[in-house]
Swiss-Prot record:
Keywords: DNA damage, DNA repair, Endonuclease, Hydrolase, Metal-binding, Nuclease, Zinc
Superkingdom of the organism of origin: Bacteria
Residues that coordinate or bind Zn(2+) 3: 190, 234, 236
Protein name (Swiss-Prot/TrEMBL): Probable endonuclease 4
Gene behind this protein: nfo
Requisite cofactors: Zn(2+)
Cofactor note: Binds 3 Zn(2+) ions.
Biological processes, Gene Ontology terms: base-excision repair
Function: Endonuclease IV plays a role in DNA repair. It cleaves phosphodiester bonds at apurinic or apyrimidinic (AP) sites, generating a 3'-hydroxyl group and a 5'-terminal sugar phosphate.
Species: Mesoplasma florum (strain ATCC 33453 / NBRC 100688 / NCTC 11704 / L1) (Acholeplasma florum)
GO MF entry, a single one: DNA binding
Length: 293
């Protein structure tokens, strides 16, 4: 059987101890024995960005080639400050569209195809109005997308978030002008917190097939959850230490139907240290033996 495509969130900054910018991102992933990676192109909480020609793209490509990492499996995460589901504040929506266009351009420059985006929050607006604002926003950025596909992330339902249900994503995909430019990222913690029970992964797969279709799943965020089913909290837990459990996450990772889809760990650091090397080893060996805490 094929080996899963498994990596984690890694840094992408001048000060990464593994190396500057994209060089450090790949070297950090390799230190975890990962075969893919996810990074932000700048801080997730602000709009300050280093020009892409300073990110060592050529060296990045060379490192990927030398280490047999398929660039098509690499994921970029859009910053949290984009909210194109906001139906009540035009300024916020306009900023989100403009900044998302910039992020798309940066992904095009780097050559990464998968851009994960949080759908956003409705604030005081109506839920359907928020989904329509999201559709409008995705239509507004579509002309910027040449190779990049936006993968909307499933959300936990914290506050006024939209995108809790696979039906939300079906609605968006059905209504955008260019559906081929929109896909989905399944976050296991968020889905669990929104009410999807990973004790029955087969049932979740049926729901995927009935709504968005499995071809629309571009990546997974593989996380355990600190909270029980339907908690709407969004607090990630280390693999095997939460309410989803090691065996259930193993089923997702090794599922033959999704074996070629990248899975990304976003689990918490333990005592300021990344747990990813141990978590990847446990998941690949199908053995919960390396304790991270």
């Amino acid at each position: 059987m094929k080996k899963p495509i498994l990596g984690s969130h890694v840094g992408m900054s001048k000060s990464n101890k593994h190396g500057e910018y994209l060089i450090g991102s790949v070297k950090e992933a390799l230190s975890y024995e990962a075969n893919t990676l996810m990074f932000y192109t700048g801080a997730p909480q602000n709009s300050v960005r280093t020009a892409t020609d300073k990110l060592y793209i050529e060296e990045f490509n060379q490192l990927l080639k030398e280490n047999n990492i398929n660039k098509d499996h690499i994921v970029v995460h859009a910053p949290y400050i984009i909210n194109i589901s906001n139906p009540v504040n035009q300024t916020t929506w306009d900023f989100g569209v403009d900044f998302l266009k910039q992020e798309i351009k940066r992904c095009e420059d780097i050559g990464v195809k998968i851009l994960v985006l949080h759908p956003g929050a409705r604030l005081k607006g109506d839920y359907t109005d928020a989904l329509n604002a999201l559709v409008k926003g995705l239509n507004a950025v579509a002309s910027s997308q040449t190779n990049v596909i936006i993968a909307l992330e499933t959300m936990a339902g914290k506050g006024t978030e939209v995108g809790l249900s696979l039906n939300d994503f079906k609605y968006v995909i059905d209504n955008v002008n260019e559906p081929e430019k929109v896909a989905v990222c399944l976050d296991t913690c968020h889905m669990h917190d929104a009410g999807y029970d990973f004790n029955n992964w087969e049932l979740i797969k049926e729901e995927i097939n009935k709504t968005i279709g499995k071809d629309k799943v571009l990546c997974f965020h593989l996380n355990d959850s600190k909270n029980p089913l339907l908690a709407h909290k969004d607090r990630h837990e280390n693999i095997g230490y939460g309410y989803i459990g090691f065996d259930n996450l193993l089923k997702v990772l090794w599922d033959e139907e999704y074996i070629d889809i990248p899975k990304i760990l976003e689990t918490p650091y333990v005592e300021d240290k990344p747990p990813y090397k141990e978590e990847i080893e446990n998941l690949i060996n199908k053995n919960f033996s390396k304790k991270v805490k």
